[in-house]
Amino acid sequence: MNYIDKSEEINVNVGTIFNLINNVDGYKEFLPWCKNSSIESNSNEVIIGEIEISKNLINWKFKTSNKYIIDKKIVLELIEGPFSHLCGEWNFEKKDKFNTKVSLYLEYQFDNKIIEMSLKPIFSSIMDSILDSFISEAFRIKNEQ
């Protein structure tokens, strides 16, 4: 099993960063490795989203169910993709009106060793920088307001 556990306190209000991360459809606009992203459904505080990744000439996609509590939490569970296991959660802790602690915990395992050998280095690289990518975009949005 592989794990990601990251957190950072940022000078962005909780609503801005939560909405950015919860809007799967917008990922393709600012995440360089995201070839496409879409929301299949959004109802009863559950989003079904699909992300297509393209990096180092390798393309793949996966779909997750994202159960959310507005401005608090997003819980991710794999629906389909090259993983035998993928689940995790984003947590948002409002520190004050302008500051938020954002945390990501993710655990994953690829379907088999061949897939793992080709995708793990790419996925690990993406996961190492994902929080920074969302924070950079949140600051861009904040500065435009």
Task: Describe the predicted segments one by one.
Residues 3-5, 59-63, 85-89:
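Short, surface-exposed coil-to-beta transition loops
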Residues 7-11, 38, 52, 65-67, ...:
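Generic structural detector for well-ordered beta-strands
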Residues 78-129:
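Beta-strand/loop substructures that line and gate deep hydrophobic ligand-binding cavities in soluble
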Residues 38-79, 133, 137:
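Glycine-rich portal/gate segments that line the openings of hydrophobic small-molecule binding cavities
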Residues 136-145:
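Short, highly charged C-terminal tails/helix-capping segments
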Residues 17-21, 27, 49, 66, ...:
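Hydrophobic pocket/interface hotspot
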Residues 1-44:
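Hydrophobic ligand-binding cavity/cleft-lining segments
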Residues 13, 42-44, 71, 95-99:
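Short strand-connecting beta-turns/loops that link adjacent beta-strands
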